[in-house]
């Protein structure tokens, strides 16, 4: 089938697509920034300025393999910084703009970041990070010619005469390009080591299956700090030589929809929540959707009802993609013209999958429910400084997804539920252990467990089961407020259930399945 025919991925760094686009389409518009006055930037300009930025990073002391944190919203500055860090020989550490102080400090420490590229608006409330993060050598702030924080202005790093690209000549299969955070299957968030070859492979796989070309215009709203936005939106646009229209939010929905009227995109990669919002918005049925070839929804489960409803309203088919941070991220996509409702589709080119009995390790047959395992060039090198977690997650080259699934006779995969403990809220990962650690620090809480509760719009939301200490009291509202300090909004508890005990195994592991409803059965 065309969508999974073998492709050849060049042994090149992740900067290769930008260098190639700058040569093939030098004056073509690479980026349009409606939130910054509609400014446009060409591929030649982006390639040139990212090399200048790399040279400035070298002047700031960046050496090959240094970890540089990137904490910006979707913007020209984000894309330029991303490629500039790679050209300086560094490793990009994407940081969520939803994070609070506690989470930012944790990620900078865990990834051993030596530099931070951010904005005045994000950094100002943080206080002095240099005193908190001893390895941190520099902070660059975007926000004008002069910053109010005593840090180098972003614009000043673009003007020097020198150019640098250390990425040329590296070993792409061994050199780490990006170190995003993932909750993995259990526990606290940890760094995922994605090589240049991992990510470049995924770009080629996605461009092929979605038939993305230089003629395409994409509205890229999903955050680039998330692996989905970084690879499937930002990265594929550059590889294909397409034009990306940048947005950092989708609310108010009226304003976001106006981008579709102004720029007439041909492709739109998004999450189920936004597809659902569009289905309920009164403006959507009145709009002209004829230029939009299709919508791709990933990051969470898309209900067949929403998938069908959007197509009925707009005439635009909705494809479904599936993946994990640990697989760069995409492994499965529904092929164009061969969509099966409720399915995540077929494995991408060069990718294999199998359904495995999680208890016995036996490979299962069609319509038997087990854990989905995947194998391909996009599978991570491992978790940063965590060989034990790596060994548990990658077995003989096969990535254990932690998702329960089944395959039909044509190989289409259907997700049933999750083995792993991570909660998926609004397409983001929420690690129960992270919130639990905060809860048990409360002076009146003896024990706590966090699980996901189904939500009609967000997929899941975190709720907590709490055991109070003897002769103490605490209200649900007070506990929710306490746990919210320093956390992103999507990680915040929606309710608290008071209980006498938390079910645990003999080893002390929380038995979350006893706190949740049983998994759904697969459809025959």
Locations of regions flagged by a protein language model:
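Conserved AMP-binding A3 loop
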Residues: 40-45, 177-201
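Conserved pre-ATP/AMP-binding loop-to-beta segment of ANL
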Residues: 9, 26-29, 159-181, 188, ...
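Conserved ATP/PPi-binding loop(s) of AMP-dependent carboxylate-activating enzymes
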Residues: 346-350, 362-393, 430
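Conserved AMP-binding/adenylation subdomain of ANL enzymes
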Residues: 200-217, 227-266, 281
């Amino acid at each position: 089938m065309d969508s999974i025919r073998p492709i050849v991925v060049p042994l090149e760094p992740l900067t290769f697509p930008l260098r190639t686009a700058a040569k093939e389409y030098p004056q073509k518009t690479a980026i349009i920034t409606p939130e910054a006055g509609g400014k446009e930037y060409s591929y030649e300009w982006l390639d040139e300025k990212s090399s200048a930025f790399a040279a400035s990073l070298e002047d700031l002391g960046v050496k090959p393999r240094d970890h540089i944190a990137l904490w910006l919203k979707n913007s020209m500055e984000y894309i330029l910084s991303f490629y500039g860090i790679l050209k300086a020989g560094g490793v990009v550490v994407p940081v969520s703009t939803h994070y609070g102080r506690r989470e930012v400090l944790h990620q900078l420490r865990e990834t051993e970041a030596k530099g931070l590229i951010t904005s005045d608006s994000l950094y100002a409330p943080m206080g002095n990070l240099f005193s908190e993060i001893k390895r941190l050598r520099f902070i660059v702030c975007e926000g004008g010619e002069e910053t109010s924080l005593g840090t180098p202005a972003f614009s000043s790093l673009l003007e020097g005469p020198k150019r640098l690209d250390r990425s040329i000549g590296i070993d792409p299969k061994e050199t780490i390009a990006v170190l995003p955070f993932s909750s993995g299957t259990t526990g606290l968030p940890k760094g995922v080591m994605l090589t240049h070859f991992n990510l470049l492979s995924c770009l080629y796989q996605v461009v092929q299956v979605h038939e993305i070309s230089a003629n395409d215009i994409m509205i890229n709203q999903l955050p680039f700090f998330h692996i989905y936005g970084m690879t499937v939106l930002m990265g594929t646009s550059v590889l294909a030589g397409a034009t990306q229209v940048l947005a950092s939010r989708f609310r108010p929905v009226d304003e976001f929809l106006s981008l579709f009227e102004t720029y007439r995109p041909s492709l739109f990669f998004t999450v189920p929540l936004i597809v659902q919002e569009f289905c309920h918005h009164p403006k959507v049925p009145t709009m002209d959707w004829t230029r939009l070839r299709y919508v791709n929804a990933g990051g969470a489960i898309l209900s067949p009802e929403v998938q069908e409803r959007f197509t009925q309203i707009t005439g635009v088919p909705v494809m479904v993609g599936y993946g994990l941070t640990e697989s760069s991220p995409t492994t499965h996509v529904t092929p164009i013209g061969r969509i099966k409702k409720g399915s995540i589709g077929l494995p991408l080119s060069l990718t294999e999958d199998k359904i495995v009995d999680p208890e016995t390790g036996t490979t299962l047959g069609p319509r038997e429910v087990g854990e989905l395992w995947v194998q391909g060039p996009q599978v991570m090198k491992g978790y940063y400084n965590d060989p034990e977690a790596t060994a548990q997650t990658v077995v003989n080259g096969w990535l254990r997804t932690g998702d329960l699934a089944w395959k039909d006779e044509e190989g289409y995969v259907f997700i049933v539920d999750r083995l792993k403990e991570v909660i998926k809220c609004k397409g983001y990962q929420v690690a129960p252990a992270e919130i639990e650690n905060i809860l048990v620090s409360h002076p009146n809480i003896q024990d706590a467990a966090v699980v996901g509760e189904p939500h009609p719009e967000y997929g899941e939301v975190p709720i907590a089961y709490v055991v109070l200490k003897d002769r103490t009291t605490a209200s649900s509202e007070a506990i929710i407020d306490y746990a919210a300090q320093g956390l992103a909004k999507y990680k915040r508890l929606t309710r608290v259930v008071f209980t006498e005990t938390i079910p645990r195994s003999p080893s002390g592991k929380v038995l979350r399945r006893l706190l949740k409803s049983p998994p759904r059965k697969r459809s025959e």
